[in-house]
Amino acid sequence: MNWRFVELLYFLFVWGRISVQPSHQEPAGTDQHVSKEFDWLISDRGPFHHSRSYLSFVERHRQGFTTRYKIYREFARWKVRNTAIERRDLVRHPVPLMPEFQRSIRLLGRRPTTQQFIDTIIKKYGTHLLISATLGGEEALTMYMDKSRLDRKSGNATQSVEALHQLASSYFVDRDGTMRRLHEIQISTGAIKVTETRTGLLGCNSYDNLDSVSSVLLQSTESKLHLQGLQIIFPQYLQEKFVQSALSYIMCNGEGEYVCQNSQCRCQCAEEFPQCNCPITDIQIMEFTLANMAKAWTEAYKDLENSDEFKSFMKRLPSNHFLTIGSIHQHWGNDWDLQSRYKLLQSATEAQRQKIQRTARKLFGLSVRCRHNPNHQLPRERTIQQWLARVQSLLYCNENGFWGTFLESQRSCVCHGSTTLCQRPIPCIIGGNNSCAMCSLANISLCGSCNKGYKLYRGRCEPQNVDSERSEQFISFETDLDFQDLELKYLLQKMDSRLYVHTTFISNEIRLDTFFDLRWRKRMSLTLKSNKNRMDFIHMVIGMSMRICQMRNSSLDPMFFVYVNPFSGSHSEGWNMPFGEFGYPRWEKIRLQNSQCYNWTLLLGNRWKTFFETVHIYLRSRTRLPTLRNETGQGPVDLSDPSKRQFYIKISDVQVFGYSLRFNADLLRSAVQQVNQSYTQGGQFYSSSSVMLLMLDIRDRINRLAPPVAPGKPQLDLFSCMLKHRLKLTNSEIIRVNHALDLYNTEILKQSDQMTAKLC
């Protein structure tokens, strides 16, 4: 081979710039790509970042093509060497350098700066020179495949890949026919991408006949390209400075000096580039990649919910009764198709989680010397318990185009979007004892039939021998005033006379329609005195109302403490209303027109209605107010003093709303005596089983109206208060009656007792 051709190749590759230029790609243009040993190529500082094959691979991988198949043939090759560099003695036989290059070296001087090296040498001539290369050409067919799409199209991705391999192997035999069939598959499925390339030396007479510089380099498994640093042709006093300048240019983009100390290397930034240690582009790419990974994580869960296996599982779930988390778990474990699909999801999310962790570690590693603090949160894996709760929400909280989250403890939905239209009718619970045997066909929320020993009563199952109509002879629990909550609220706003309970106002500290000082606690009581006046009734409270007037320009609000005695008795035998706790309502304040008076209303409704005989109300200021020495708050009110006037309020009206229930004390006392007698005779329950069932029903219905308590604490025992104050039983008699009922409930009916707390 003549010297001119070698010289041409020499100048072509020695002075060809193999350097890194700043990348201007958008973050969307790259994605996670090659194996771990090539991860450094994602940086703009990688020497092959702009190579054609690398960019093509990244672009195809971003489009979802994960497999590359390439078939090629070489049609010529020969190896050339840079004989000028192979000379051992560069002092006696210097390398024949271009005059421009020699002039650039002389311009550097004896002690050039890093920036001088970059501007004079590196930006013009690069950092490496070519030692040897293999020239030639190839004809190739490259095919990128997306196995997931092939799997969906054909049902078996392995067979599809083998068929494509066989088709591509006939490329060099029947090129036109093979390409036509491959293009048809590419258009119809979108699962493959086919590229033809013909590169190589087309003629040796001139460089213009070559496709590109890289086209003459064969890309095979052997190492075909050998480079060496450009410092070997520099004078010795410039070699170290050139290496330092080249590293600063490659690793710091020419924006600082690359220094290493104590095994830690970093860029010492110039004043005009204070953020040179922070690869903003790489960080943005990784943040964008992490955001896409988080979206893919969410999409993986949606794909499972939209899969045929999950939909068929939802269709097979029984809809004729309520499904608890445990029963859904049992159906979940018995569905083998869903289990295999769920295992695929787990393996996919585990692989995705590892990718996210690797990328996040790289992101935080790159951000060590940045002012930019990355904000990334690892997506949480949905546990099996969360999947079961999700299934429950899809069953019962997916109605009218709205959706929500189901709360099994409350058997209700929390709808999203500030609406209550997402809840479907919640089916009844099927089980043993007093649970339903079957739900009603007319109303799935109610029982349709009951288990043996129980009977259906108003949509629920009760012990068979209990006659609820007979209980009404003792206490008329159900009246014509059992309104719905919305009706009750409307009637209370209108002050309907049907809900008035005529009580007696008692107070030594307050007089109605008279101003008083709120800096001291005030007490008043509303009582019925049923033991003297209305012995044939017990009374139910469903709300309270109070009209409070203030002085002008006063914003003083009272704070209420309300104690209720359910069946008379001392103050210690009452319970405190827990306003705003455990779902208990609060006072509502409404101002009356053209006045300084307000209506304070408390609506208990059907949920929190309860028995009452006396209501004790304590009032005090909500905020701590200044008091004057030697004042007791009992003297006459001086409204002329402007400093005191703001502390005065008056109550013009106070009213309890509710209704009365008929109460047959004599009949109930005879039933209690029968229970007491059966207990004293050694537990002869069978002879009086109807009475025992009747008293159990009455006790349950009375204690059901007890006030709310904190979770885990026992309910208050109102039944014992009724026995003590309305039937006048002694404490020993009350203990015997309750013990007899508990024994019958546990030993005969085989039901668990509900713990209660003593009130009276």
Swiss-Prot record:
Disulfide bonds: none annotated. Residues 1-16 form the signal peptide. GO terms for cellular component: cytoplasm; dendrite; glutamatergic synapse; neuronal cell body; synapse. It comes from the Eukaryota. InterPro entries: BRINP, MACPF. The keyword Signal applies. It is found in: Cytoplasm. Residues 68-251 form the MACPF domain. GO terms for biological process: behavioral fear response; brain development; cell population proliferation; cellular response to retinoic acid; central nervous system neuron development; central nervous system neuron differentiation; exploration behavior; gene expression. Keywords: Cell cycle, Cytoplasm, Glycoprotein, Growth arrest, Neurogenesis, Signal. Glycans are attached at N156, N433, N443, N553, N599, N630, N676. PANTHER family: BMP_RETINOIC ACID-INDUCIBLE NEURAL-SPECIFIC PROTEIN 1, MACPF DOMAIN-CONTAINING PROTEIN. Belongs to the BRINP family. Plays a role in neurogenesis and brain development. May suppress cell cycle progression in postmitotic neurons by inhibiting G1/S transition. This is BMP/retinoic acid-inducible neural-specific protein 1.
